[in-house]
Amino acid sequence: MKIFVKTLKGTHFEIEVKPEDSVVDVKKNIESVQGADVYPAAKQMLIHQGKVLKDETTIEENKVAENSFIVIMMNKSKPASAAASSASAGTSQAKSIPPSTSQPSISPQTPASVSAPVAPAPTRPPPPAPTPTPAPVAATETVTTPIPEPVPATISSSTPAPDSAPVGSQGDVYGQAASNLAAGSNLESTIQQILDMGGGTWDRETVVLALRAAFNNPERAVEYLYTGIPEQAEVPPVARPPASAGQPANPPAQTQQPAAAPASGPNANPLDLFPQGLPNVGGNPGAGTLDFLRNSQQFQALRAMVQANPQVLQPMLQELGKQNPNLMRLIQDHQADFLRLINEPVEGGGESGNLLGQMAAGMPQPQAIQVTHEEREAIERLEAMGFERALVLEVFFACNKNEELAANYLLDHMHEFEE
């Protein structure tokens, strides 16, 4: 019978197969038709309806009917030397991660308590890296989709919970929320994994800058590397030595702030938690350094929104760093206190409801994205591999409209999408 073989570039060709042919036989057939220099059988990967076909299975077992199509991809060659194989261990982990050690990038939002993805400022800040400018696109078609979450690559960085983290169920939720953040000894391995993933596309300083902008979230850092690092992250933070064990941490020096409206009036910037300046902290050594946040209506509203939708914490912290950098530095210095406060139960509604609405109004909304005719065809080809349109759109735009990168991600994480 006749079947069609499609490539990621949009071309296709036909071959003759038998229902009892194994996948290995089909690969050899493609090699003989197209040439060993173009499609060597050993490097071929065949996909049908979103699933990679195993070599030992047959065409009939995989339900490949006459005049149907399969998608062909080429596996990358692996280094043969032992030294090279040990050095590439981080790369293989970055490309394919078992579901037991990583969380799907596209998953329902269920945890009620979250951890703060806050990274301490490095003592040796790297110089700013140029932000890549996306090429202009001719607008011919419109696809309406929400702004995608970062999904170009999932790098698992298991971060242990700090001693002050809640115990029991809250601790479990914290572990889930923190599993995608790199910290401590895992940070260096995460940097190396991203460098290996890029294959020389980025230098180390650029990767460190992207991680700092993403508060050590590897997924968001990779997204920044493809789409551009926010300008706010390109300003190196001030290097600060850690506070000694016998002395309480002092808050950073206060910069002069403009006169603010009375406390009873509305706050024009809901994410500027203290428009009149930070209160005096550290007066009570027995209390948490950030306990003064409890009295802030803006923080109460932020906490309610984060507990309802944990994914808004990242953009909120980025905006907070712009509106109130002094408070952001204080949070970075006292992450455990911030985690404890952000996970405390929300009490009452009252005025915090209005502030919640103000914050929600400032969050990104679904927007119309223009695509060209070629990009629309690329989206349709990804759909033809057996994936849902919504998932294809999210991955395609998160991968900066790189069809091959999107296809690789979809195939590497298809077991997560099936769940």
Curated annotation (Swiss-Prot):
It holds the Pfam family ubiquitin. Belongs to the RAD23 family. It is found in: Nucleus; Cytoplasm. GO terms for cellular component: cytoplasm; cytosol; nucleus. Keywords: Cytoplasm, DNA damage, DNA repair, Nucleus, Repeat. Residues 119-135 have a biased composition (Pro residues). It comes from the Eukaryota. Residues 1-79 form the Ubiquitin-like domain. Residues 185-228, 372-413 form the UBA domain. Widely expressed in the whole plant. May be involved in nucleotide excision repair. Binds and presumably selects ubiquitin-conjugates for destruction. Prefers multiubiquitin chains rather than single ubiquitins, with a binding affinity for 'Lys-48'-linked ubiquitin chains. Acts as a ubiquitin receptor that associates with the 26S proteasomal docking subunit RPN10 for the indirect recognition of ubiquitinated substrates of ubiquitin/26S proteasome-mediated proteolysis (UPP). Involved in UV tolerance in hypocotyls, specifically in dark conditions. PANTHER family: UBIQUITIN RECEPTOR RAD23C, UV EXCISION REPAIR PROTEIN RAD23. One of its GO terms (molecular function) is damaged DNA binding. Residues 83-118, 136-146, 245-270 have a biased composition (Low complexity). Disruption phenotype: No visible phenotype. Increased UV sensitivity in hypocotyls, specifically in dark conditions. Its main location: nucleus. One of its GO terms (biological process) is response to UV. This is Ubiquitin receptor RAD23c. Residues 288-331 form the STI1 domain. Interacts with 'Lys-48'-linked polyubiquitin chains via its both UBA domains. Interacts with RPN10 via its ubiquitin-like domain. Residues 83-172, 235-282 are annotated as: Disordered.
